[in-house]
């Protein structure tokens, strides 16, 4: 992410801790999702967990806060190790305090409740994050961006966090994934209250415009931004790191948002982004545009490897109102294509005069290693105290330079105090999350790993009627109707529409129903 997610106001219950508290009940919101294979898409009923930095932390002996405003409590936290021993991280009122609501297949994140913003992770069980291995796979989900204005970011992305939140590696971390510890990303955020089982007390400098601050240390790891967006602009961006998994950095060597040298030793903070507006198509994404953000749509992202097994291409396309919409083509001189490849990234950096830290940190090949190794799924809603989200939806930097036009938002937009006051009811809803091998989604045209009309072959943004294909190899025991897991309906479908007992034809989208 361009700026660390925690660079914004946290109005209540903010701090970190590494002991496990018991004063507030721990009830994670539920989320149903699917992992698909050629044999079908079994349903997984799991939960989401709120990041540790948002939680109330208090003395293990009582309810005295370890962190108030944007300062550590001096008696409890004279140094990092003492603070970790003295402070407990507690449960959360997900809906009332943090605006996180899970309902079946959907998770909604509201921007302002008693708190401002939120970040949550998909769980495998009560003590482990769900780890997704997405190299040569595709992931798709529905999203409603209609209530996310300019200046906000409703994001879904991957982080190479430890599955247990760092408990095994760092014995002083007693809270672990159950309390959502161990966050990291390619910005190497230094505003995290706890890193590697100790408090980030040393060198802590309180922020001048929010309830955070920065310490001497940051937490780095590879990051894949699948979806960063509001109803004005969107971008998808790989961020490789030379060391894939979570690791701690120190001072300006961290790079990223909070360091004097943005281009640190470990991670590519800028990444290689595909933002349709930035790439010259100003009519592709937004309210009333080709991808119309006034209503819900599906995002499909494919991570395609080459014959050597390395990540070679990241493709994205969309589905709305029964149509597959290919990603827009670049209209920038010297940059071609509508997907992220190594050549696209090199050409883009040259055309815009950007520092090519992406290639220096290993490029797509290094990003592919992280995807193969498995990453944690993250969902968030946030505003940006570092750059007012201009890097996503406005002109950035100012004055104008090549590649600075990123969205139609005014350069005066995104000021957190104004966004908080004027758009408190903003929310993003992610739903119907699924992943599996290339071609498994009903929108991607079978095993080829591309949508029915190849995005790379189109000279301009187009849309076409979807051609869903059955991925089932199951047989139909009764000899009539569709087989178990096979397609049984959808726009343009002419096959059997009944299912053998005890299965029923369940609608997944307007263009696809399946015997389940």
Curated annotation (Swiss-Prot):
Residues 18-445 are annotated as: Catalytic. It catalyses: Hydrolysis of (1->4)-beta-D-glucosidic linkages in cellulose and cellotetraose, releasing cellobiose from the non-reducing ends of the chains. GO terms for molecular function: cellulose 1,4-beta-cellobiosidase activity; cellulose binding. Pfam families: CBM_1 (PF00734), Glyco_hydro_7 (PF00840). This is Exoglucanase 1. It is found in: Secreted. Glycans are attached at residues 45, 281. Keywords: Carbohydrate metabolism, Cellulose degradation, Disulfide bond, Glycoprotein, Glycosidase, Hydrolase, Polysaccharide degradation, Secreted, Signal. Residues 480-516 form the CBM1 domain. One of its GO terms (cellular component) is extracellular region. Residues 446-480 are annotated as: Linker. PROSITE patterns: CBM1_1 (PS00562), CBM1_2 (PS51164). One of its GO terms (biological process) is cellulose catabolic process. Residues 1-17 form the signal peptide. Its EC number is 3.2.1.91. Its main location: secreted. CDD domains: GH7_CBH_EG. Residues 449-481 have a biased composition (Low complexity). Residues 444-481 are annotated as: Disordered. It comes from the Eukaryota. Disulfide bonds join 488-505, 499-515.
């Amino acid at each position: 992410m361009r700026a660390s997610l925690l660079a914004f106001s946290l109005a209540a219950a903010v701090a970190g801790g590494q002991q496990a508290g018991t004063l507030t009940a721990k009830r994670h919101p539920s989320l149903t999702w699917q992992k698909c294979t050629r044999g079908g898409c079994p349903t997984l009923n799991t939960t989401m967990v709120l990041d540790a930095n948002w939680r109330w932390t208090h003395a293990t002996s009582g309810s005295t806060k370890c962190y108030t405003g944007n300062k550590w409590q001096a008696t409890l936290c004279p140094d990092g190790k003492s603070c970790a021993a003295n402070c407990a991280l507690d449960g959360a009122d997900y809906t009332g305090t943090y605006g996180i609501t899970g309902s079946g297949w959907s998770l909604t994140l509201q921007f302002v409740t008693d708190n401002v913003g939120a970040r949550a992770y998909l769980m495998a069980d009560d003590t482990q994050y769900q780890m997704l291995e997405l190299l040569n796979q595709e992931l798709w989900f529905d999203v409603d961006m209609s209530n996310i204005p300019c200046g906000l970011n409703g994001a879904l992305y991957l982080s190479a966090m430890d599955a247990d939140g760092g408990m095994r590696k760092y014995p002083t971390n007693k809270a672990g994934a159950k309390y959502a510890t161990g966050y990291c990303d390619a910005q190497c955020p230094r505003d995290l209250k706890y890193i590697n089982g100790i408090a980030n007390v040393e060198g802590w400098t309180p922020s001048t415009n929010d309830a955070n601050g920065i310490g001497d240390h940051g937490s780095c790891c590879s990051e894949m931004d699948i979806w960063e967006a509001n109803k004005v602009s969107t971008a998808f961006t790989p961020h490789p790191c030379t060391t894939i998994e979570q690791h701690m950095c120190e001072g300006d060597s961290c790079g990223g948002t909070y360091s004097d040298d943005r281009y640190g030793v470990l991670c590519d903070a800028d990444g290689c982004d595909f933002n349709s507006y930035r790439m010259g198509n100003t009519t592709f994404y937004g309210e009333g545009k080709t991808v119309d953000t006034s209503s819900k749509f599906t995002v499909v992202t494919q991570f395609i490897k080459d014959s050597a097994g390395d990540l070679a291409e990241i493709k994205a396309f969309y589905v709305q109102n029964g149509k597959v919409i290919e990603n827009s083509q670049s209209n920038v001189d010297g940059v071609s294509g509508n997907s992220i490849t190594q050549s696209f990234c090199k050409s883009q950096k040259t055309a815009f005069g950007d520092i090519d830290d992406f290639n220096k940190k290993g490029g797509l090949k290094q990003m592919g290693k992280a995807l193969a190794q498995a990453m944690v799924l993250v969902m968030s809603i946030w505003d940006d105290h570092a750059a007012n989200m201009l890097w996503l939806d406005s002109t950035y930097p100012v004055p104008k330079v090549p590649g600075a036009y990123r969205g139609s938002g005014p350069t005066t937009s995104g000021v957190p105090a104004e966004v908080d006051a004027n758009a408190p009811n903003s929310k993003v809803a992610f739903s119907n999350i699924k992943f599996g091998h290339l071609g498994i989604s009903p929108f991607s045209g079978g095993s080829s790993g591309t949508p029915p009309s190849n995005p790379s072959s189109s000279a301009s943004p187009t849309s076409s009627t979807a051609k869903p294909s059955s991925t089932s190899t199951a047989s139909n025991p009764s000899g009539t109707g569709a087989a178990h897991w096979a397609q049984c309906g959808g726009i343009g479908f002419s096959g059997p529409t009944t299912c053998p007992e005890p299965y029923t034809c369940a609608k997944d989208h307007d263009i696809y129903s399946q015997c389940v």
